[in-house]
Amino acid sequence: MKRLLLLTLMIIYVVPFAGAQSTPAVVNPAIDMQGYLRISAEAAKYRESRRLTEAEFIQMSREDGTVILDARSQEKYNELHIKDAINLSFPDITVESLKSTFPDKNARILIYCNNNFVGAEKPFPTKAPTASLNLSTYIALYSYGYRDVYELGPLLSINTTKLELISTPQSVK
């Protein structure tokens, strides 16, 4: 009787774990979490010296060969964006779209995101700090080989910023 009870308990506790160990990992060669974590750590170190004050951002934006990238959705970009910024929505960042938009990987690119502005929640909805679009955009550009990337650092009020913010007129349908 004791043996039967012991055997039953072993089956109850051991069998579920045995099955879990034999389940094969789901592999997708187009998704590389370990590579992403590695490149993110590398980009994070590189990024620290490339965060700009508002004045530095304005000064750099006026220099020849510098472009401003707005990676928010086209809708949010149209509502309000930094004057002269180019819109390339984050989900649309690919090898092809980057080649088309920034053919020179050595071009200086300035980035900003929702979490750089307060006072206009509709065009600049706040994201969780760890989900800031600046972080994703910086890592993506770094992953594709763009190294001359700078990020607007501070949180600015749209009412007091020295950056010129404009709307894109919508075409009439």
Positions of the model-derived regions?
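Positively charged n-region of N-terminal signal peptides that target proteins for export
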Residues: 1-4
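Bacterial N-terminal signal peptides
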Residues: 7-16
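Rhodanese-like catalytic fold shared by cysteine-dependent sulfurtransferases
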Residues: 18-48, 78-82, 86-88, 93-173
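A short, well-structured juxtamembrane/interface segment
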Residues: 46-60
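Short Gly/charged-rich anion-binding patches and loops
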Residues: 56, 72, 136
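Short, solvent-exposed loop/turn elements at domain surfaces
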Residues: 59, 76-79
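Short coil/turn segments at beta-strand junctions that form active-site/ligand-binding loops
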Residues: 64-69, 105-108
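Short hydrophobic beta-strand that contains or immediately precedes a catalytic carboxylate
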Residues: 67-72, 85-88
